[in-house]
UniProtKB/Swiss-Prot annotation:
The organism of origin for this protein: Homo sapiens (Human)
GO cellular component: cytoplasm
Lineage: Eukaryota, Metazoa, Chordata, Craniata, Vertebrata
Pathway: Protein modification; protein ubiquitination
Reactions mediated catalytically: S-ubiquitinyl-[E2 ubiquitin-conjugating enzyme]-L-cysteine + [acceptor protein]-L-lysine = [E2 ubiquitin-conjugating enzyme]-L-cysteine + N(6)-ubiquitinyl-[acceptor protein]-L-lysine
Name of the protein in its database record: Probable E3 ubiquitin-protein ligase TRIML1
EC number: 2.3.2.27
Length: 468
């Protein structure tokens, strides 16, 4: 077997079935066949069928293959060896490039001529018949490969043109599905909106009924009190009481009136639960940490700067301008001058707490009320079984049926929007009127005073990344 045949056999063994070239980063599939990594992945990508071996078409359990580094090294060596052999043949064929034509003529006379000099006397020569045939075969082989590759490219082009139409049809179908589903969602949300509005209207009617009934009751009580006052004043101004029984009667009639303490009616509104609000808000989740430089000296912060509680004893901390000296307050490290931001705070079973947003320039010294526009906060207050929420500033209260355990804070800086949400049931607690922010804003937190040991739990900033 000639060297050329050996080289050809070696090339066939080290050639990828797909690209018909020497292996490049070869991998071996479950069935034992090897391919270039890029070729195999491209083949699987182009054929939208169950994964199979491109050579034997055996169905594979999955995209499993092993790297075959040794085969890659052999292919690299064979490529270099082939190049050297071809170069050697060219050098042998160029033996006729000699200073004189005598050697070429002598070899030609012996019938073993490898070269024939050109008639113009130049040094350019012809290859021997054997070398010429070898190169002709190689050219034909390359030509055949090029034709195969062109045929493959034409097939892929035809397939891609079909995929263009298919892609357009699939996109059109998906758009129709999206429009249809969002129409259903819009209808669902519209119905939810109507239900919430009806619920609020019913609660408004009930609250108005309570207020009117209490108004009538108080009016009657005032009339009775006025009548009794007039009777007693009239009796006391006379020179002498007509009888002891008259005095006793007046006292007996006044006793029930004295026992009736005027009371204001408690009105309640359900927190507005908005479907899908939690998912929408959490798209704007912002990592919030506490700023130790602003914390009141009585406050204790956790190591991760996510939790704060009232410590009970004053810590030895510098009285820097940023620190709150009277209010049990700490600011968040983050400073906002743009964008939308949302975070949640676990308030747990605390009986008093305050969370919200304030201007970065808010006063840190003293304990005076903050001017309107400097502070946007939500205050939770529990006294006995009575639980209420207050917003500041200006201060405005609202009774709620159940305590809020987790508060969501939302800021849209550009639109001037700040709102508080119940982080447990997605309901809206309060939305401030639209404002125009002209300076930086920061989160603000206050665990408030311990209240004789009933309010010692911490405020904890929740991590939302794992829930999104």
């Amino acid at each position: 077997m000639s060297t050329a045949d050996l080289m050809e056999n070696l090339r066939e063994e080290l050639t990828c079935f797909i690209c018909l070239d020497y292996f490049s980063s070869p991998v071996t599939t479950e069935c034992g066949h090897s391919f270039c990594l890029v070729c195999l992945l491209r083949s699987w990508e182009e054929h939208n069928t169950p994964l199979s071996c491109p050579e034997c078409w055996r169905t594979l359990e999955g995209p499993h293959f092993q790297s075959n580094e040794r085969l890659g090294r052999l292919a690299s060596i064979a490529r270099q060896l082939r190049s050297q052999v071809l170069q050697s043949e060219d050098e042998q064929g160029s033996y006729g490039r000699m200073p004189t034509t005598a050697k070429a003529l002598s070899d030609d006379e012996q019938g073993g001529s490898a070269f024939v000099a050109q008639s113009h006397g130049a040094n350019r020569v012809h290859l021997s018949s054997e070398a010429e045939e070898h190169h002709r075969e190689k050219l034909q082989e390359i030509l055949n490969l090029l034709r195969v590759r062109r045929k493959e490219a034409q097939a892929v082009l035809t397939h891609e043109k079909e995929r263009v139409k298919l892609c357009q049809e699939e996109t059109k179908t998906c758009k129709q599905v999206v429009v249809s589903e969002y129409m259903k969602m819009h209808q669902f949300l519209k119905e939810e909106e109507q239900l919430q509005l009806q619920l609020l209207e019913q609660e408004e009617k009930e609250n108005m009924r309570k207020l009117r009934n209490n108004e009538i009751k108080l009016t009657q009580q005032i009339r009775s009190l006025s009548k009794m006052i007039a009777q007693i004043e009239s009796s006391s101004q006379s020179s002498a009481f007509e009888s002891l029984e008259e005095v006793r009667g007046a006292l007996e009639r006044s006793e029930p009136l004295l026992l009736q303490c005027p009371e204001a009616t408690t009105t309640e509104l359900s927190l507005c639960r908005i479907t899908g609000m939690k998912e929408m808000l959490r798209k704007f989740s912002t990592e919030i940490t506490l700023d130790p430089a602003t914390a009141n000296a009585y406050l204790v912060l956790s190591e991760d700067l996510k939790s704060v509680k009232y410590g009970g004893s004053r810590q030895q901390l510098p009285d820097n301008p940023e620190r709150f000296d009277q209010s049990a307050t700490v600011l968040g490290t983050q400073i906002f001058t743009s964008g939308r931001h949302y975070w949640e705070v676990e308030v747990g079973n605390k009986t008093e707490w305050e969370v919200g947003i304030c201007k970065d320039s808010v006063s840190r010294k003293g304990n005076l009320p903050k001017p309107p526009g400097d502070l946007f906060s939500l205050i939770g207050l529990k006294i006995g079984d009575d639980y209420s929420l207050w917003v500041s500033s200006p201060l405005k209260g609202q009774h709620v049926r159940e305590p809020v355990c987790k508060v969501g804070v939302f800021l849209d800086y550009e639109s001037g929007h700040i709102a508080f949400y119940n982080g447990t049931d997605e309901s809206l607690i309060y939305s401030f009127p639209q404002a125009s922010f002209q300076e930086a804003l920061r989160p603000i937190f206050s665990p408030c005073l311990p209240n004789e040991g009933t309010n010692t739990d911490p405020l904890t900033i929740c991590s939302l990344n794992s829930h999104v």
